[in-house]
Swiss-Prot record:
Amino-acid biosynthesis among keywords: yes
Residues that hold NADP(+) according to the record: G165, R166, S167, S190, I231
Name the record gives this protein: Bifunctional protein FolD
Family annotation (InterPro entries): Aminoacid_DH-like_N_sf, NAD(P)-bd_dom_sf, THF_DH/CycHdrlase, THF_DH/CycHdrlase_cat_dom, THF_DH/CycHdrlase_CS, THF_DH/CycHdrlase_NAD-bd_dom
Classification via Pfam families: THF_DHG_CYH, THF_DHG_CYH_C
One annotated Gene Ontology cellular component of this protein: cytosol
Keyword Amino-acid biosynthesis attached: yes
Organism: Prochlorococcus marinus (strain MIT 9313)
Catalysed conversion reaction: (6R)-5,10-methylene-5,6,7,8-tetrahydrofolate + NADP(+) = (6R)-5,10-methenyltetrahydrofolate + NADPH; (6R)-5,10-methenyltetrahydrofolate + H2O = (6R)-10-formyltetrahydrofolate + H(+)
Biological function: Catalyzes the oxidation of 5,10-methylenetetrahydrofolate to 5,10-methenyltetrahydrofolate and then the hydrolysis of 5,10-methenyltetrahydrofolate to 10-formyltetrahydrofolate.
Entry-linked HAMAP family: THF_DHG_CYH
Stated family: Belongs to the tetrahydrofolate dehydrogenase/cyclohydrolase family.
Biological process per Gene Ontology, one example term: tetrahydrofolate interconversion
Gene for this chain: folD
Amino acid sequence: MALRLDGKQLAAELEQRLQAEIAAGLVQAGRPPGLAVLRIGDDPASGVYVANKQKACGRIGVASHLTHLPETVSVSKVLATIQALNIDERVDGILLQLPLPKGLDEGPLLAAIDPEKDADGLHTLNLGRLLKGEPGPRSCTPAGVMALLARHQISLERKRAVVIGRSILVGQPMALMLQAANATVSVAHSHTGDLASLTQQADVLVVAAGRARMIGAEHVKPGAVVVDVGIHRLPLDPELGTQAKARLCGDVRTQEVEPLASALTPVPGGVGPMTVTMLLVNTVARWQQHCGLPFGLRDLLV
């Protein structure tokens, strides 16, 4: 049976560490870390994600500043809001909640965020820092995956890693982080032919395809570490009526893969909690930098 890489447990441990970092620097800083969340529109899923991030801030002592703009907002208004947050001395990290409503291009808006306040690690400058191995905010989901692997002492040295998905949000930065850990990395995508022949070579398989239950036993090498980044809400069973509960799944068919894998992230409770925690890590690290405090989180921002 595969070892379950419990992101929920590690996230709780890291929250305690972040609390201690904040407590140690609070007197010298004169203020707590601040995270500004910019939400546009009323997408229900985005509302849930924003609420979860605000709760996490509250648990560790980060001040949360929410700005909620209507779906019909102009680009100029969004840019003005971002510029105001860039110069707000209470704010150490800025998060633009994605996805955006139709008609808004995330590229120019992400680029408008001060790279030193980039809580999501998605600014072009910070992606370049990652590419060059320079310090800076890191993309939250890939950084969370790396922390999970490190926590369970899963070595990447000379391992063959395959990342399914090439998004800027997950796939591309994930590949760079694995390379930096001395893995040999291949990136698969929607135009990759004979996917199984590639993934069966992987000692570490990271699946960020965005397709529910895409990966099964036929894709997995025995003994591989399988990281499932996907999360999907399955349709409710109409026969259960009001008793029906929403079910979640990932990109991996867990029941098929678990007997083969040496380690596996569950869905939910694997990568998801770590994504939120790494957002907090980026924010607290920026606070330490902005306030001239000792930087105690270097090992989490590889």
